[in-house]
Amino acid sequence: MATVIPGDLSEVRDTQKVPSGKRKRGETKPRKNFPCQLCDKAFNSVEKLKVHSYSHTGERPYKCTQQDCTKAFVSKYKLLRHMATHSPEKTHKCNYCEKMFHRKDHLKNHLHTHNPNKEAFKCEECGKNYNTKLGFKRHLALHAATSGDLTCKVCLQTFESTGVLLEHLKTHAGKSSGGVKEKKHQCEHCDRRFYTRKDVRRHMVVHTGRKDFLCQYCAQRFGRKDHLTRHMKKSHNQELLKVKTEPMDLLDPFTCNVSVPIKDELLPVMSLPSSELTSKPFTNTLQLNLYNTQIQSMQSSASAHQMVATSLPLGMPCPIDMESVHPSHQLSLKYPLSSTSYAVSMPEKEQPLKGEIESYLMELQSGMPSSSQDSQASSSKLGLDPQVGPLDDGSGEVSLSKGSVPISEPLNTPSLDFSQLFNFIPVNGPPYNPSVSVGNLGMSYTQEEAHSSMTQLPPQTQDPQDPSNSIGLGSLHSLSAAFTSSLSTTTTLPRFHQAFQ
């Protein structure tokens, strides 16, 4: 039987075995065998020691290759991390506010703003809080510098003065100390420095003299866009307000393809010739009421003529929609009444003869009788005695309304002839002209519409030997003469007014 000798090799091996499980962290971590000659730091590789040495010498061998970017870095890793900022694509997204970042560490620093239980580094001397450990160390270094300790709390490097220490602290985070931004970008033509490269490019117009921004209102040029914007708000504020309030789609004022309703007061005025607009104002209410009667008759025949295309002297080639004309609307005077004019009162309009004349015109519409017997019968309906004397007798039994005579039914009969009523058109005369002038007001009609128009001609001397005129309408003839004289002249109006009072 074998005996166990103390100090046996197998026993030594068993006692030197490492227990199973995880190794200690200190045993697996390589030793820092490469110390820095300028400070007390040591590194586990030559590459890390070399990168650290750049912090003492200020050398940055890895430069950015982008145009207009002068940044340089101490390591290749930091250069690649910086190159991501030039890319338009931001791959790191915040899950709380959907903000995008180029770098992961920027996103990590941003997430502290959303975390209510975030770790805050608080300074015991002044009470300030910091989200990052690097910012907190930089802040502690500032307190140490003010107290006389010129050692950097980040890299434990000692400096000879406070100014050098402050400049060294800027290199750790790339930010200025104390929250004050540094003007790192200098102009190539002068000694001015700026915060960003964009400010440098904007400043270059001072040296080049280029003014590429033009004001659209006064043609003044500016070298910078913000100067143009300031000029627009200061000098052209009213123009900017008009641009904001005006609609984008403006109608063409010269041509139109749709029917435009015209105001009732302007309709008879626009139908006048341009010479009569200034020479002959409306001085008679009877003339205006004649126009109201014609408008009513034109509207009543709207089944055959929906749109009346008129040639207006005002340069408006738009068709007039007659549906917009109200038949009951009285036309207002453009000029005040003169001394020879008179207004029609409401009691005069309500004379009993108004209904009889209206029924007579309806009888004329149904068919105009050609024989003298029918004419006498129609005149008897009016209640006019053939033996009545002239109007100058002042009998006053028959008073005619000086207002407009409304036509309730459309006058579409082609046989309609007002010569039987007014008796001043020759029997065998030429046919009426399609272009009819009513009261020297010049309303134009087509041949189809001219059958309902009234024609004024100079009064004819009545031939007593003509059997066609001896139909017993002497009083009607005298009435028509006074009626037509009131249309043409204004001097006989007072006499006409006195005769019917």
From Swiss-Prot:
UniProt keyword annotation of Repeat present: yes
One Gene Ontology term from the biological process aspect of the record: positive regulation of glial cell proliferation
InterPro entries (alphabetical): Zinc_finger, Znf_C2H2_sf, Znf_C2H2_type
Keywords from the named record: Activator, DNA-binding, Metal-binding, Nucleus, Proto-oncogene, Repeat, Transcription, Transcription regulation, Zinc, Zinc-finger
Domain of life: Eukaryota
Subcellular location: Nucleus
SMART domains named among the record's database cross-references: ZnF_C2H2
Tissue: Expressed in nephroblastoma.
Chain ranges for the short sequence motif Nuclear localization signal as given in the UniProt record: 22-25
Main location: nucleus
GO MF annotation list: DNA-binding transcription activator activity, RNA polymerase II-specific; DNA-binding transcription factor activity, RNA polymerase II-specific; RNA polymerase II cis-regulatory region sequence-specific DNA binding; zinc ion binding
Family of this protein: Belongs to the krueppel C2H2-type zinc-finger protein family.
Name of the protein this chain belongs to: Zinc finger protein PLAG1
